[in-house]
Regions:
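Bacterial N-terminal signal peptides
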Residues: 9-16
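Acidic-and-aromatic substrate-binding clefts and catalytic sites of carbohydrate-active enzymes
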Residues: 34-44, 60-71, 90-99, 125-130, ...
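Structural recognition of the beta-strand scaffold that forms the well-ordered cores
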Residues: 33-35, 54-59, 85-89, 115-121, ...
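Boundary/entry segment of secreted carbohydrate-active catalytic domains
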Residues: 20-62
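Functionally critical loop-and-helix segments that line ligand-binding/catalytic clefts
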Residues: 25-33, 169-243
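Catalytic domains of cell-wall/extracellular-matrix polysaccharide-remodeling enzymes
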Residues: 116-190
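Acidic (Asp/Glu)-rich catalytic clusters
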Residues: 45-52, 71-82, 104-113, 188-190
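Conserved, mostly hydrophobic/aromatic
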Residues: 48, 78, 119, 143, ...
Length: 243
């Protein structure tokens, strides 16, 4: 019994250490970014911008009803600081793709120069046996129809390989979470390539209290700019048309 208690204590300590290991910047990539939510709370965006940060993904919505409490403020502040911004939706298996797409569209108005919308999908459907791919695909299609741009799929590598290697997903940009492997970038089969890599979840920047996720873009600045949203005509009034 004492052995089991000691073993459990060591496991707890190791997990805590692994989750708080400081993420070092990967400066060999030309385009650098972070992703945030209400957990980051107060941010000095001018200080962040002075540290060679180019883009910021911010959580906008989750499921069919939840909006991140700081999304409106962050969305405006990122723009004012001269950084490229992107909004992501955390997908829930407990409401329909249609409801979730409508919620995102009502919340996020893209402007020229923003990153495409992101679908964060990393949990199974509610019966734990069905793949989320069909619901995710429906969300992606509805969002693409509304904004006229290919959304980005965010997930971790194992989940992507299990659910999103089908032909129907091949044209969507990929944002992969893969930590603690600075010399081992994400692997995407069938000749596909990741667009963004979230390589750590405990980075530190002046202007942000505590940890923040670090990300990089796979290529050069010219390729990055080609990915950015170009239309300026989208607004939430088109929700019913898209759905």
């Amino acid at each position: 019994m004492q052995y089991k208690k000691r073993l459990f204590a060591w496991i707890t300590i190791l997990l805590a250490v692994s989750c708080t290991r400081e993420t070092k910047r990967m400066d060999d990539y030309a385009v650098q970014g972070i992703d945030i939510s209400h957990h980051q709370q107060i941010i000095d965006w001018n200080k962040v911008a002075d540290q060679d940060i180019d883009f910021v993904f911010v959580k906008a919505t989750e499921g069919s009803e939840h909006q991140d409490t700081l999304f409106p403020k962050f969305w405006n502040d990122i723009k004012k600081a001269g950084l490229v911004r992107g909004a992501y939706h955390y997908f829930s298996p407990y409401s329909s793709a249609e409801e979730q797409a409508k919620h995102f569209i009502q919340t996020v108005q893209l402007e020229k120069g923003d990153l495409p919308p992101v679908l964060d999908v990393e949990i199974m459907d509610k019966d734990q046996n069905a793949s989320p791919r069909q619901s995710a695909l429906r969300w992606l299609q509805l969002i693409e129809k509304h904004y006229n741009v290919k959304p980005i799929i965010y997930t971790y590598q194992k989940f992507y390989l299990a659910h999103f290697t089908g032909e129907e997903f091949k044209d969507y940009p990929i944002w992969i979470a893969r930590y603690n492997s600075p010399n081992n970038p994400p692997f995407i089969p069938f000749g596909r390539h990741w667009s963004f890599w979230q390589y750590g979840n405990c980075g530190h920047l002046t202007g942000i209290k505590g940890c923040v996720d670090f990300d990089v873009f796979h290529s050069d600045r010219e390729s990055f700019e080609k990915l950015l949203y170009q239309s300026t005509s989208t607004d939430s009034a088109g929700v019913q048309k898209a759905l």
